[in-house]
Amino acid sequence: MSQGMLTILSAENHNHASSMLANTLIDLISQNNGETTIGLAGGSTPSLAYSILGQETDLLANVIFWLTDERWVHHDDDLSNSKMIKSSFDKNDISLLYPDFSGDNATLDAEKYTERVLSSFTEFTCAVLGVGEDGHTASLFPGSNALDEKGVKFVSTNVEAHPRIRLTATFELLAQIKNVYLLVTGNNKKDIVEEIVKGETNLPVNHLINIRTETHLLTDQL
């Protein structure tokens, strides 16, 4: 498979990378005529960028946020990405689409979330993604059943992390997003950043880069 274009934005440290990402999103929203849709990753890495972005209250009025992946828990659970994201935006009343938690059928919950997202908008402006030390992005982990899913936008998957059951966007969905930003910071991510830049291994993050025309990497490890 041919390698997609990787645009690297080097930062001095995590705070600098977070500020760069937030300002990039602010510029994108400002330049976008009409509604903007932004996919958000969970975890602690992007929380500062979200907090900076959350200060732009008026600008966010025309933004619909959605989740690139979610732990299969209630959206108010302390483990949920939804709760972390809302907290990061410092009580700014953002429009965030999150999946319902049935508690008994993750596959059906993923299907319903697909319907919720696609009925709300049809154009995916951009998304923020993290990358794990094992090369996973969203909840597309190495060896996961979700890696080979075709014809669907979100699926449920079992992963080697807690909680095990996740809902995740598929490669098919992530490939059609106009702008994808990988935020990868910290000394523990140095090795995986090198793997991303080399592009020689078929880790989930490298596969994503290869199926896209262009992907942006913001990191303090280069």
Regions found by a protein language model. Give the residues of each.
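A glycine- and small-aliphatic-rich helix-loop capping segment at beta-alpha/alpha-beta transitions
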Residues: 52-60, 86, 142-150
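ATP/nucleoside-binding phosphotransfer catalytic cores, i.e., glycine-rich phosphate-binding loops
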Residues: 178-222
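Class I SAM-dependent methyltransferase SAM-binding "motif I" and its flanking Rossmann-like core
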Residues: 126-129, 133-172
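Glycine-rich N-terminal segment of FAD-binding domains in flavoprotein oxidoreductases
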Residues: 27, 34-54
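N-terminal glycine-/serine-/threonine-rich phosphate-binding loop
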Residues: 1-38
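Short, conserved loop/helix-junction motifs that constitute active-site signature segments
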Residues: 56-64, 146, 172-178, 208-212
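Ligand-binding beta-strand-loop-alpha-helix segment within the catalytic cores
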Residues: 2-5, 60-128
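Glycine-rich beta-strand-to-loop/alpha-helix junction loops that act as flexible
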Residues: 40-45, 129-133, 185
